[in-house]
Curated annotation (Swiss-Prot):
GO function term, MF aspect, one: mRNA binding
Domain of life of the native organism: Bacteria
HAMAP family: Ribosomal_uS3_B
The protein's role, per its UniProt record: Binds the lower part of the 30S subunit head. Binds mRNA in the 70S ribosome, positioning it for translation.
Transmembrane segments: none
GO annotations of cellular component type: cytosolic small ribosomal subunit
Name assigned to this protein: Small ribosomal subunit protein uS3
Stretches for region Disordered: 218-239
SUPFAM superfamilies, per database record: Prokaryotic type KH domain (KH-domain type II) (SSF54814), Ribosomal protein S3 C-terminal domain (SSF54821)
Residue ranges occupied by any KH type-2 domain in the UniProt entry: 38-106
GO BP field: translation
Amino acid sequence: MGQKTNPIGNRLGIIRGWESNWYGGNDYGDKLAEDDKIRKYIHARLSKASVSRVIIERTLKLVTVTITTARPGIIIGKGGQEVDKLKEELKKITDKEVQINIFEIKRPELDAHLVGASVARQIENRISYRRAIKMAIAAAMRMNAEGIKIEISGRLNGAEMARSESYKDGRIPLSTFRADIDYALVEAHTTYGRLGVKVWIMKGEVYGKRELSPLVGLAKNQGKKSGAGRGGNKSRRRK
């Protein structure tokens, strides 16, 4: 089962918290669609700010948006001008007061979305996908990841027939629920079409009780300094 499901969704309520935190009645669908609209808008508006996750919390009159990013200075701007502009733009979407919190990702090499976005950006700039993937894997293992796997699918190097290739270092125990695995899917837009880049990063195992807030686990992993990643197996699989 662990091989077929999204690793994040599979661990919700166990070691991972939800990224939308609010209660809804008959307006549940509208709020969910609004959350999706907010996330898409932020990722498009801040495409150069290395935004990873957008966590949304709601009360009756306030929407709190927490943005996790590796480049907070771009979002905040000089004297906070840019974040004030963003707040006004989000008010038009929600018709409510908006509060924006910025959380800095200090180790982007261990964030699956940022790793995938980096690989996708290099592919769009015509850098060899093998080189981009191997560099990303090496960087993650240097930052003490216990394992990382990257899979790329599509018309690789402009081939007429689409295929998939995966590269792995360390261990990714997808069926172990206490395994803290980050996952992301990012698309690269090339002249030959879209390429899908999937990233799994194993950060360690969680024992005992854990507060199910997305930021708790993120803060813990950013400050984590452990020994070298377990498992030395390096493998590549082609389909």
